[in-house]
Amino acid sequence: MTVTISSDALDFLLISAESSPDREICGLVLGEGDHIARLVPCSNVAAEPWHRFEIDPAALIAAHRAARSGGPAVIGHYHSHPTGLAEPSPRDAADAVPDGSIWLIAGGNRVTAWRAVAAGRRHGRFDPLDLACVDGMAAPQGEDSSRDFA
């Protein structure tokens, strides 16, 4: 299965990950089905953000409220592995809910896409997805956005 993302959004994710070498970055993936329309940067509120992420619950609630009001749906989230690979870790698998959501993981100057499922091929929780860049999609937005894509 292939997930689509804009080249600007992919660049944003790579640049954000590279600019945070000591902490995992994280955010929400908005869109429909396997079409990523927008990335929304969120604060990492994890107690140990250097090797774990937790999306700010207020940002998650706000995104779900916006979706109920006609905005794009939350279809997943993204995070980085500052010193690791762009692959789900055993910790990611332990924290993942097998709900079919998309996980984008940045690490080693790469971004990979995964679907959280029961009995996945990676750590029993994730199946790999192909990631295809397309242009003309909405750029990342959010309070932590460090680059202007307008």
How would you name each of these model-derived features?
Residues 1-74, 82-150:
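Conserved beta-strand-loop surface patch within small alpha/beta domains used
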